[in-house]
Amino acid sequence: MKRPVFTGAAVAIITPMNTDGSVNYDELGRIIDDQIAHSTDAIVICGTTGESPTLTDEEHTECIRYTVKKAAGRVPVIAGTGSNDTKYAIWLSKQAEADGADALLLVTPYYNKTSQAGLLAHYTAIADAVHIPCILYNVPSRTGCNLTPATLAELAKHPNINAVKEASGNISHVAEIAAACGDSLNIYSGNDDQIVPLLALGGKGVISVLSNVAPQYTHDICAKWFAGETAESLSMQLKAVPLIKALFADVNPIPVKWAMNRLGWNAGDCRLPLVASSAAVQAQLETAMQEFGLLK
């Protein structure tokens, strides 16, 4: 059995921006401290929610270094270093390891339309090049590429391939992965509305967008499940559904950055080509935040 990088709720943290569009490292530091104070179990930096596609190489590596330094060993730091260019992913992954990241989050190659054999070769090459755990990231709605259970079972034989973040939204697919891989691969939910279903299939937690605005709550969904308080965990999961729906009423991370700004954080805007949500989406999110209790 592979020891999980974390158990519980990891925040897929936003990258706050200044008004001139540069990364607001001071605010990132404040958010990191607040997340840890509210029981976040790990921090994922430079993921989808962190706007990794529009960060420069310098910003990407600096965000990882800054987060490692700020977290200071209090929680694991997982660096998003995936790419559709294997050579580049290896470079970025080795840099993140050298800068102190505890693990890597590696999205499947996108746009290239590689085969399952290509995925095996891609991930094996990255895992061979580093000495820290690799969490694979399956999100076919964004990448057009789906990691099959058979491919994951083969990849799980590699000692550095520790887990998969499963964001297909297909709970049957998750069940097939769990059956195919057993204890050789940890599974994390990549969907906030499917935390409890995935835990019921043996999952170890969630890499969460919701946790940006409700870190303690998201942690508690997992903690209560692992403590045997499954009815309470389920109740909390269901209560959060309207808020989760609102957080994904537009392309992530547009709504969650709006919500963070609304809560008083200096999250800033998303970088182009992402633009602000419509007034209707903002109103939906405002209502959901009020009903959930985030706003008075």
Predicted regions and their residues:
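Glycine-rich phosphate-binding "P-loop"
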Residues: 138, 160-161, 271-272
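Short, amphipathic alpha-helical "lid/cap" segments that border enzyme active or binding sites
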Residues: 25-32, 149, 282-289
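Active-site beta->alpha loop and helix N-cap motifs at the rims of alpha/beta catalytic domains
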Residues: 2-11, 15-144
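Short helix-capping segments at alpha-helix termini
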Residues: 69-75, 99-100, 130-132, 157-160, ...
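Catalytic alpha/beta core domains of metabolic enzymes, predominantly
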Residues: 128-129, 142-248
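C-terminal alpha-helical cap/extension of soluble enzyme domains
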Residues: 5-16, 38-40, 200-203, 207-296
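A general structural signal for well-ordered alpha-helical segments in protein cores
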Residues: 28, 60, 64, 89, ...
